[in-house]
Design a protein with these regions (language model features):
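Basic, glycine-rich
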Residues: 134-138
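Phosphate/NTP-binding elements of NTP-utilizing enzymes
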Residues: 58
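Alpha-helix capping/helix-boundary segments
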Residues: 22, 54-55, 92, 111, ...
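Active-site neighborhoods of divalent-metal-dependent phosphate/nucleic-acid chemistry enzymes
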Residues: 11, 66, 71, 80-125
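Short, well-structured N-terminal submotif of metal-dependent ribonuclease cores
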Residues: 1-50, 64-76, 80, 118, ...
Length: 139
């Protein structure tokens, strides 16, 4: 269920967790975002969030040469999109024990656990996320 709350600007405000791919698409290739994802990202009433795990994933994959996104690029993307960094806690980590193994990517599994614990929808182009019961996907 999408977590809704009254907006200080009037109306309904939606929290949305961007997965790493959604952030990269938003920055490097917005044409790869779905129409729905673009609309949600561009709505100023929505609160966009990024897992701290996504920053870890970007740093590791950049160091391994799998991504061409520097720390400065990531910082700029977060600032330009007005994204709030969602800290990763032990509550999120313990939820990993309950997740079925539909997905072997450790970064994605941590982000999925975080979205489930926080009860917020996630923006992702990854079809495997839909295998997780209770996870609301915006794409």
């Amino acid at each position: 269920m999408t977590k809704l709350r009254p907006s200080s600007r009037g109306g309904i405000e939606v929290r949305l967790l961007l997965d790493t791919a959604a952030l990269i698409f938003a920055v490097e290739s917005p044409e790869n975002l779905s129409t729905r994802a673009k609309a949600v990202l561009q709505n100023p009433q929505n609160t966009l969030e990024l897992s701290a795990i996504s920053l870890v994933e970007i740093a590791i994959k950049s160091a391994l040469g799998k991504l061409r996104l520097s720390a400065e690029d990531a910082r700029r993307a977060v600032d330009e999109l007005g994204v709030r960094i969602l800290p990763y806690t032990s509550k999120h980590a313990f939820h990993l024990f309950e997740l079925p193994l539909h997905h072997r990517d450790p970064f994605d599994r941590q982000i999925i656990a975080q979205a489930l614990v926080e009860k917020i929808p996630i923006a992702t182009p990854d079809d495997k996320f839909s295998l997780y019961k209770g996870l609301k996907i915006i794409w």
